[in-house]
Amino acid sequence: MQLNFKRSLALLLLSTSMSVYAQQTYTARVVNQETGEPIIGAIVSSSNGEKALTDAQGRFSLPLNENQTIRISYLGFTPQSVNSKSFRNGMVIGLIPGIDLQEVKVTASISSARSKKALGSNVEHVDVSKLTANEHANSLSDILDGRVGGVQMYQSNGKVGMPIRFNMRSGATISMDRDPIIYVDGIKYNTSHISDINSSQDALSALNDLPIEDIASIDVIKGPSAAASYGAEAANGVIVITTKRGSFNTKENNKAAIQVKMSLGAASLARKYNQFVNNDPLNNFFETGWQKNLYGTVSKSFRGNQNMFFSYNMNDVEGIVPGNRDQRHTTKLAYDIKSGPLSVSATASYVHGNISLPQTAMGRYDAIWNLMINQTPWPYVEESTWRAQSWTYNNDRFLGNIRLGYLLPGAVKLETVIGVDVNSTKGVYRLPYGYLLGNNNEGAKNVSNRRNSSFNWDIKASRRFKLADKWNLTATLLSQIARQYETVNAINASRFKGDVDNIAAATERNVSENTFEQRTWGLYGEAFVNYDNRLFINAGLRRDASNLIGSNVASIYYPSLSVAYNLENQKFRLAYGESGRLPYPTDARTSYVMDGISAYGPTVKPQFKGNPNIRPERMREIEFGTDWTLAKRHNLSLTLYAQYTSDAIIYENLLSSDGWIGSIPRNVGRIKGHGIEFGYNGLVWKDTNKHSLDVYANVNYQANKVTDTGGSDITNYPNVIKKGYPVYSFYYHTVEKTALNADGTYNTKMGAVESSDYKYLGKPFPAVNGSFGFNLKLFSNITFGTKWNYALGASVYNQSFYNTAGLGDNLKKRNDQLTALANATVGTPEYEKIANDLAYTARFRANYIEKADFLRLSNLNVGYDFTSLARKLTNNTITSMKLSFSVQNVFVITNYSGADPQVEGNGGNRKQRGIGSLSRDITNAPHPRTYTATLSFTL
């Protein structure tokens, strides 16, 4: 017995000593494979459960047994696994920046984020942090335009703070409300533009408050096939913005990470005017606009799985139009905590802005019109009067959310998000006393106070079920309550006795107040099936209810279905979905106004006739696509889609003889659309880790056609909605011949003879558009990149030149023709040719609907990474440093004769009742060329 005990004890000691001998503590270092810089906070885990984080030098220590595997991962890098057999003390492990595109987490629906390989639709993900590291961006359009297939977006004109026009896929809708829904960290963002004290073209964009430097990534959901889960307003797609926050991958006892980014830039007129007899006053009117930006962040992890992120952004941007300036301060605080089954995230950001938006277009008293129309400038208003006026908006905006997640018993995951967006804006227009504007030299002052707010509360429950071997089902149920409320009161005062700041002293005053409220409730159910991580099937159904008047608006259903199948290097996807657009708030309401007083009391008369049976517009979309990965370096994507819009709202004119004025809405419109999207990005050249060349390109084709208008055309000439033609087509009389007097001389009053019929003259959307560019790295430290945008097939109504040709004397082409005509002999072939040419420069709409094809070098950037030198000189106090220089809107090649082929006279897209207009150049301010130098460093 004693002998057996001694033998057992000896064996135990021997095995223990062998185990201790087999397990050793290894030390290694993790670096960026391309730059050699240490990666701080990388997660190192072994197959037996041991974990470690890399320190400030990228080092870690971990006990390992023989034949174990360790995995090293860090956000933004491809994870790497190493077997302990090949592990050596002091070895250096390099992580490759970037991750497999199919593994990128993107917003799949309102209820979930999934890897791209699980998506049946083409949802595009943009890593904004990476983009803004090399190039400067002032607006959302600078980031997304040209980088997302099937999407075209640009500012309506070249001033600071202007609205953005969105062209999403085929644009198969009659509605002027063409903006996508925008979410920021789960907050439904209010996108209403503000034009309370100026014209719609010079409106203040709601997107001006977006914190560009704070954006980490953007997911773009382009159509109903993917956006059906977002309900009744998602036909234009959804843009999901995720802002920066702290990371759980950093050590608790690490010092706070501090990042600073400083930019200094200048904007100037990109294309000088040469289309006029006297160009100097117009070219000299524009000035250099200086731009300053300071951005700083502090992030820190704390004990107990907590982290905090703080940022501050100062933006001071001047435009090229005198007086156009945007001064904005933004602060943001984000907090995250994970404790067992509970996770809590909260975000609060505050924007204080002051922007001056001088009015330069849309009226006879505006600057560009007065500089363009006549050879002698300022015919309708004195320059001193225009410069004395001021249009300013002061706005304060708060964005806040709280997100809670909890894992209930039974593996049910419960999540809720509450989001708030509150924007208060005060607009003030001033015409000082003593300056003559029209017939008023006694001053004017308009004041508006607006409060736009949005609230959303989302709550969802989800659970994963194992159906069979390799088969899994995730079921989700989500409820969303949303409220949008807008109120504005305004007072317009004029004709003072002196100081215009005392509104009570005005002899003419007008007060107005308007409110708008929209409440919606959506219930969304989703079933997501996963087979062997290769086949993914997603089915969803959304039911929406709204407070808008109308029996058919109270309850609406939107289904969706998608399938994705993955091979080793290729994915096939198919998706179908439905969404829509809600009617205008007053479409279902019949209203009357008081007409007087009778012996029996007040009398009323009809004002607007509503349609209580009005339905939301419905868009159905199906898309098919495939994605390839070739040689692990090249990624290609091809998507084909078709859209079918029914119940489009057409406004039929009412007969005044029936006692009504205006129009009544009816669901009689139908439109079809289709398109193709092709994208490529790849690493086409790499030499060790010092040199590389990345190339990207996308090509998009889109078309739409109106198939029903209820039997009548809807016109806002030269834009029309007409069966058989694209929506908002240009459709008008054409010029047939010149106008001659009986003696053979040119009739300058008539100008030309128009055709009696109408003809199709173009459309406001390009048939083909896209972008291409490259990013080059040399010697590890030097970067050089470009982005080119192009479009073919769109037209623009050049209303600026149309008016100048007939109402002024400054259009050079026509002026030269008139001069040549005066020197020619009546009745000669030369005279007849010049007279015929004059017919096509006369003030007729068809003469000024122009092709607007273009190729634009949108961005050119170069940078140098000083990290190694900075670390050496500061003893690692500065952990990274980069200097970059970028130029935006370098040049454009176009067949459009106006200031810029990408302008929008109505100020972008907006909510309005009835047909509007698209692609009109109404003395729009041109887009500037911008130069920006940026220095960024991390402590």
Enumerate the language-model features and the residues they cover:
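Flexible loop and strand-edge segments within Gram-negative outer membrane beta-barrel domains
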Residues: 264, 291-313, 317-324, 328-398, ...
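Extracytoplasmic gating/loop element in the C-terminal half of outer-membrane beta-barrel translocons
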Residues: 267, 791-882, 887
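Conserved small-residue
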Residues: 261, 265-278, 666-672, 686-764, ...
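Short acidic/polar hinge/loop motifs at secondary-structure boundaries
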Residues: 61, 187-222
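Extracytoplasmic beta-strand/coil segments of soluble accessory domains associated
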Residues: 142-188, 217, 227-247
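N-terminal periplasmic "start-of-domain" segments of outer-membrane beta-barrel proteins
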Residues: 49-59, 107-134, 161-165, 193-200, ...
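Surface-exposed loop/turn segments flanking beta-strands in extracellular/periplasmic regions
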Residues: 273-281, 362-384, 428-445, 485-513, ...
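Short, acidic, small-residue-rich periplasmic hinge/interaction motif at the N-terminus
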Residues: 31-35, 42-45, 73-77, 88-131, ...
